Amino acid sequence: MFIREQKIRKPNGKSYSYYSLIESVREGKKVNKKVLANFGALSKSDVEKLAKRFSQIAGLSVDDESETDSEVVGFKYFGIPVFVRQFMKSLRLDEFLDSASSGMRIKFDLVAAFEVMVAAHLFKSGSRAELSVWDWQQKLFWHPHVTEDLDYQHLLRALPIFAGLQPPLEEHLHGRLVDLFSINVDLVFYDLTSSYVEGHGNWSELLIRGYSRDKRFDCKQIVIGLVVTREGLPVSWRVFEGNRLDSKTLDEMVNDLKTRFQLKRCIWVSDAGLLSKENLGVMRNSGYEYILGAGSGTYKEVKKALKTPEMQFEKIADVNVCERKINLELDDKKKISCRAILIDSDGRREKTAAILERRLNLVRDGFANLKKSVENGYYKTQEDIHIAAEKVLHKSCVKKYFCYEFGDQKFDYREKYELVRSQKEQAGRYALLTESKLEIEDIINGYKTLLKIEDAFRVMKNDLDLRPMWHKCDVNLEGHVLLCVCSYLFFRMLDLSLLKGELPTTPGRALQAIKEIRAVGIEKKHEHHWKLMKISNENLKLLDAIGIKDLKKIFNQWAVSAPPYNYERRLWTTQEEALKNRTK
């Protein structure tokens, strides 16, 4: 085991040294080097002290002077709480939570609980189970106001409180975002996703099996509706039952936003999943304009328009566009006239045709194998052959392109090639329905921006760990979703800060850089001190972009009253439970 120095020369000509603890491991005839720890940039004296300390641990002889040297006892994350606290102050969330909870009989720091769980979603890798978050929070170098140690039960008790504060929290965040980013909620995007749990979930009224965006139809789930601005900042969200249809959520969301936010003019943008006669009536009655995606499988008038061969397209916003007026019927039998922006996209055609071909190939291979099995006598009765054929077509989404015949020890199939060819030709066409007087290019660009909400769902599921959900009551599930959305808000605010500061990096990489800013606990002559690790110029620029100007000053203020380093991994919630588990 040894300490390795790695020198890196930057484009500006300066050289920097980074140190790692390396262990040599022999595997057969080879000796592989394994990195045990990365120390980052250290001074020569710190390297010598580390070497002496490791020598002491290994039982090697060292100079007597080592008794008076400093000893590194551990480190804590300092960049994480500073980052979270900065955005909390920008949004005045600490003031909001203190004010909202002033009349509640809460015996723990609600602001600290919010900060810890948001920080965990943004920075902590691995499971988001409350017990692991409760353990992980000890590694954070917090502001002196976080004096009490949050218990596992405090984090659980905070979730229903956050869920109950959601409506006023949404209104508070909307007001602050208008002030900070000068956002204009004249164009909002609405979409839904689902999130499943692995368990019976019999206690829940929300967890119900339904259409799963994650292809987990075997699991119970919730449906999450999210409204974001053109900048991708969340405005409002709701947790629905797992079997709620997309088209049955729009009425509630539109009326709720109209009542609480007093939006006079607003254009709602949604995909084809929200298009229905009922929802068209909802949008017209709300007084808001709309841009709704529509495929060939919705209104017959739209289907007929998309299949018209003599359409005259023109190139607008990188796609072929043709505008028509069509009459649509609402749920009350009333007829309306709206604009149909018919779009023919080569990129969409290529992608959709590739998806269709992949699904067709799966059925082709399945039927070919089934035919071979019947010929070899594996399936003999008509019933067995019929069941096997339906299994091949089940969930393939291409059943209409095939037909088959079967009998005793007989099976044959045929593909409808003309229908497949026609479908591939129409694959790049879709329509946008609107009554807005916007220019065609603005309508198309507005609909393309709908990708921002899809990006929000991707970030929450992949980066912020919306799953797994370990909660055993519906109100805690709603609190969990609220924390995920707030974490995504911080994520988007960081992205906008990077764009404003013209820093060529992603929010994910920026979060990793912030995580590397640490406070080191040092003991010298039985006295404990905190030191701030050296910060690179790139990290200083990053901190400046998000509004943190003097990190050392903040650290010195926090370190004055910070307790000595102390961390013990906690495996159980209470000492009594630990003893109980030991005796089993």
Q: Language model features by range: what are they?
A:
Residues M1-A113:
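Conserved glycine(s) in the ABC-transporter nucleotide-binding domain "signature"
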Residues F2-E5, P11-G13, S17-S20, G28-K29, ...:
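Anion-binding and metal-coordination hotspots
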